[in-house]
């Protein structure tokens, strides 16, 4: 039986246009106004916005090894609640997906428990120790989406160069958390006026930018697609912009929290605002927004990083880095940037859906049209609501945005035409 999404509105040339959508066998088979019902199951949308599903290439699902923070099941429920139909979990788990055995075990857990499409990363080095490279070819054959040691930077240039050479031969991407360990200095936040005022050790911006500068030259030499995770500083933006102008195959992402906040959000020793990379200066903050708009940064990824409440309820120097983002990304960005006229709705959808898929050559996140995969998110753009921890489907709610009032509530998420999330039905 087909499914008919009736009475929704889709984006056409930045205008919302009424269209019904018929789905059959996981694909869109018909679009138009007032389609015949035939024998379709009908879902009434009452004028709500219908978007292609979002693609998040940077999440932490914590399984295996960190199930008290998040599981594949809870993390993908949260993703679906946020409108994401494809997510890519990072390999900083225990064990690390650094072998065929480990990635196959992960694949089985995904098959059993995931509520949305999950494309797992494999690590670059064994156990993410930065020393011995994994078997790139074997891991690709067993479903690795790309290769990253996210959570730490690859410290040795020769290791990164060889990794890029192997990835390039397989037409795979190297995805990098960029951080020179010799420049961290035990920091817990950005090194700047706020860290000095609070007497909390800081991490300088150059810690990130130095490693990006090294890596773009290695990527050029290896002719490898090199993707930079969670860009946070104006220096990093400058390096990436120059590399793109030079024709180097570099792409980059930015998180919602780095687009929304800067270091001045931290007014006391509060680990809910501890993230890596840290919130930096207002100058950095504005550079990130400008870089996204001019294409230096390609898209938005959440870096959804759940932690248990007791882990975050510590001083910043002791608590883990990270905040959750799967369930809050769209409403926060829509409220801040689209509602006030800085961006169009189409731009936001490009950053969350279309461009992540394009950068990694995925068939997901593409525009809604006949023949496309029925990954669909339905959103009430006019509904205002408060972000509350008790409403989260994630096992964790470590975010500074609790209590914010936002617009853009996800009502329904479909993955290949099947309901992954429907408001009020969380079973």
Swiss-Prot record:
Catalyzes the reversible cyclization of carbamoyl aspartate to dihydroorotate. GO terms for molecular function: allantoinase activity; dihydroorotase activity; zinc ion binding. One of its GO terms (cellular component) is cytoplasm. Zn(2+) 1 binds at residues 58, 60, 150, 303. Its EC number is 3.5.2.3. Its cofactor is Zn(2+). Substrate binds at residues 60-62, 92, 276, 307, 321-322. This is Dihydroorotase. Pathway: Pyrimidine metabolism; UMP biosynthesis via de novo pathway; (S)-dihydroorotate from bicarbonate: step 3/3. Pfam families: Amidohydro_1 (PF01979). Zn(2+) 2 binds at residues 150, 177, 230. One of its GO terms (biological process) is 'de novo' UMP biosynthetic process. It catalyses: (S)-dihydroorotate + H2O = N-carbamoyl-L-aspartate + H(+). The gene is pyrC. Keywords: Hydrolase, Metal-binding, Pyrimidine biosynthesis, Zinc. It is an enzyme of class 3 (hydrolase). Belongs to the metallo-dependent hydrolases superfamily. DHOase family. Class I DHOase subfamily. The active site is at residue 303. PROSITE patterns: DIHYDROOROTASE_1 (PS00482), DIHYDROOROTASE_2 (PS00483). Gene3D superfamilies: Metal-dependent hydrolases, Urease, subunit C, domain 1. InterPro entries: Amidohydro-rel, DHOase, DHOase/Allantoinase_Hydrolase, Dihydroorotase_CS, Metal-dep_hydrolase_composite, Metal_Hydrolase. Binds 2 Zn(2+) ions per subunit. The keyword Transferase does not apply.
